[in-house]
């Protein structure tokens, strides 16, 4: 999915902490990889190609991806975002978001005679398949994820009688299972790797026979972005994460930056949200972006920083990503690249 490469950190390390390097020039450390993952790229292109093929309006259940700029751009092109299928006129075209939906949502769309295109990320679909498989084998499934997140709701909906949502380490004590010999954990794909492992460790203390998923559920892009932030954060007085507040993986990047040694970290949707007071006394600014963030928004932050003397931009490369997912079958002929 992603090919790891030797660390090309681009960092002139100092024995001093970031806050004590007051004689050094201002610089930007730019995390690579960052921004769009393969699943987000596929989902956004799915909506764009559906517009080209069918014309406006088309409907999307929930936000196609958790990014305000992407949603507003698509709205300008004639996309209508809805919370539930009963808001869509019968017979209309409905796209399911990258986060996936439960079988009940598919059934509801069919009852309204909606034409549907499924933009669920294939890595989310993999977790759905795991949930169904282990439910068939009558396992208790402990789904680590954020209560109320669309992805978690979709996965839990595949096997509601077998899934218990575990929202972080503090939720572990309340978990009960039917048979401690048949328990497996799965996870939301966009979590903090470190926090997820803490939750798993707590679960295993309670349920020693807890089984691991057949393959890693936290997606390659989430992990890669966290690794890049960890690599640069110790050198940063400030890390700016470009992403929306309802983006789980973007919020996690702020937490990872602070946990890895950044003196401060903030989440912004746009360059205009950067508070110039954050830059006072700051030599090194790290920049990254969540997996649903278009690169144009990152460039806006880089340009803003350049206006304030941060002209030296150094990449921090920890992995190369080459994965591309095929479009949904209904739209594959429409892909030109």
From Swiss-Prot:
EC number: 1.17.7.4
Chain residues that bind isopentenyl diphosphate: 66, 99, 149, 247-249, 292
Record's signal peptide: none
Keyword Magnesium: no
Annotated residues for binding of dimethylallyl diphosphate: 66, 99, 149, 247-249, 292
Keywords tagged on the record: 4Fe-4S, Iron, Iron-sulfur, Isoprene biosynthesis, Metal-binding, Oxidoreductase
UniProt enzyme class: oxidoreductase
GO MF: 4 iron, 4 sulfur cluster binding; 4-hydroxy-3-methylbut-2-enyl diphosphate reductase activity; metal ion binding
Reaction equation(s) it catalyzes: isopentenyl diphosphate + 2 oxidized [2Fe-2S]-[ferredoxin] + H2O = (2E)-4-hydroxy-3-methylbut-2-enyl diphosphate + 2 reduced [2Fe-2S]-[ferredoxin] + 2 H(+); dimethylallyl diphosphate + 2 oxidized [2Fe-2S]-[ferredoxin] + H2O = (2E)-4-hydroxy-3-methylbut-2-enyl diphosphate + 2 reduced [2Fe-2S]-[ferredoxin] + 2 H(+)
Binding site for (2E)-4-hydroxy-3-methylbut-2-enyl diphosphate: 66, 99, 149, 189, 247-249, 292
Chain intervals for the UniProt region annotation (Disordered): 1-24
PANTHER family for the chain: 4-HYDROXY-3-METHYLBUT-2-ENYL DIPHOSPHATE REDUCTASE
Family as reported in the entry's similarity comment: Belongs to the IspH family.
Protein name: 4-hydroxy-3-methylbut-2-enyl diphosphate reductase
Organism, scientific name: Rhodococcus erythropolis (strain PR4 / NBRC 100887)
Lineage, top ranks: Bacteria, Bacillati, Actinomycetota, Actinomycetes, Mycobacteriales
Gene (UniProt): ispH
